[in-house]
């Protein structure tokens, strides 16, 4: 889990555009965040398995 201070820092607008970085909207994790969903890989996997992301299904080939 991210510290509350880092989540609050991420929620306010950055002074310059280059200072913005992606952070998971659900848990606040800063690494491996998918831009399309704004979720980290762990939260994305949990929501996909629960069927809460429409159109996403487990790959099999």
From Swiss-Prot:
Binding annotation for Zn(2+): 24, 27, 40, 43
Keyword Metal-binding included in the entry's annotation: yes
Keywords: Metal-binding, Ribonucleoprotein, Ribosomal protein, RNA-binding, rRNA-binding, Zinc
GO cellular component: small ribosomal subunit
Gene Ontology MF term list: rRNA binding; structural constituent of ribosome; zinc ion binding
Keyword Ribosomal protein found: yes
Coiled-coil positions: none
GO biological process, one term: translation
Cofactor: Zn(2+)
Cofactor binding note: Binds 1 zinc ion per subunit.
Matching InterPro entries: Ribosomal_uS14, Ribosomal_uS14_bact, Ribosomal_uS14_CS, Ribosomal_uS14_sf
NCBIfam families, per the entry: PRK08061.1
Subunit (UniProt): Part of the 30S ribosomal subunit. Contacts proteins S3 and S10.
Family the entry assigns: Belongs to the universal ribosomal protein uS14 family. Zinc-binding uS14 subfamily.
Function noted in UniProt: Binds 16S rRNA, required for the assembly of 30S particles and may also be responsible for determining the conformation of the 16S rRNA at the A site.
UniProt-recorded name of the protein: Small ribosomal subunit protein uS14B
Source organism per UniProt: Lacticaseibacillus paracasei (strain ATCC 334 / BCRC 17002 / CCUG 31169 / CIP 107868 / KCTC 3260 / NRRL B-441) (Lactobacillus paracasei)
Lineage of source species: Bacteria, Bacillati, Bacillota, Bacilli, Lactobacillales
